[in-house]
Amino acid sequence: MTQQPEILHYAVSVVGKDRSGIVAGISEVLFRLGCNLADSSCTMLAGEFAMILIVSHPRPFSKSRLFDELKPVCDSLGMSLALRTLQADEISRQETDGEICIISVYGADKPGIVYRVTSELARRGINITDLNTKLIGTPEEPVYVMMLEVALPEGETPEGIEKILANLKQELNVEIGVRVVTPVAF
């Protein structure tokens, strides 16, 4: 019985001034190389575009080759590039015992909103799986919006999280909502 070679995975990070064609340029290189795009997250923040990709290749494939192929495209797009080899235990999907919830926070912009909310969640062992913030409203009346996707540990409930965040809601003078994400089976 022959052993299958281990599939190599890399984390690819690309950051730079936003412009059209970034995703197409990077994904074209990955396609030409025969890489599979497993997970990705792309966003624009204050005119800067950032993408993080988890890519795999079924055959032995060096990190330096991947870098050498991506670097000219990144240079032509004015993007910085970083690569990291991932070990097998780093790419396994983490199953959560508890529920997945979305927490929304919004109110007048002020320092400390992210810190206060996330430190309270961390203190209770709640893992943040996604976090986005945005300043909306007008220059005269800015409104800060934060959306978090969290995985509740065993024993925590959405109602319990609402209770703990109720104190912060008053202290920070913000609105905080918690809702459960219902998984969909495919």
Language-model features, listed with the residues they occupy:
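A conserved regulatory-domain signal marking ACT and ACT-like small-molecule sensing domains
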Residues: 1-186
